[in-house]
Amino acid sequence: MKLAYTQNALGTLSHLPLPIRKAFYKQAVFLVANLHHPSLHAKKYSESEDRWQARVNRGWRFYFKIVGDTYIVTEIIPHPR
């Protein structure tokens, strides 16, 4: 699988604090290797939009779509509690 980013996700990623950015990159490696990696806690977030959610850390989540053999990261946001 490959990883791609929307402009929105890239903009957010460039402004994240370094520890959050590093945690995201670590999780992105896990995502590319195995969607079901335990630390991702990946789940289908919206069936109608075919949108998935995964964990960056306890306070941050990222959202992505699966298109062919590519994961497209659409958003990286604080966890909506």
What kind of region is each of these model predictions?
Residues M1-K2, P38:
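Solvent-exposed, charged interface segments at domain starts and junctions
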Residues K2-G11, H15-K22, R55-R81:
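Enriched for short, Lys/Arg-rich terminal
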Residues Q27:
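A small-molecule sensor/coupling module
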Residues F30-A54:
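A short, surface-exposed loop/turn module that caps and links secondary-structure elements
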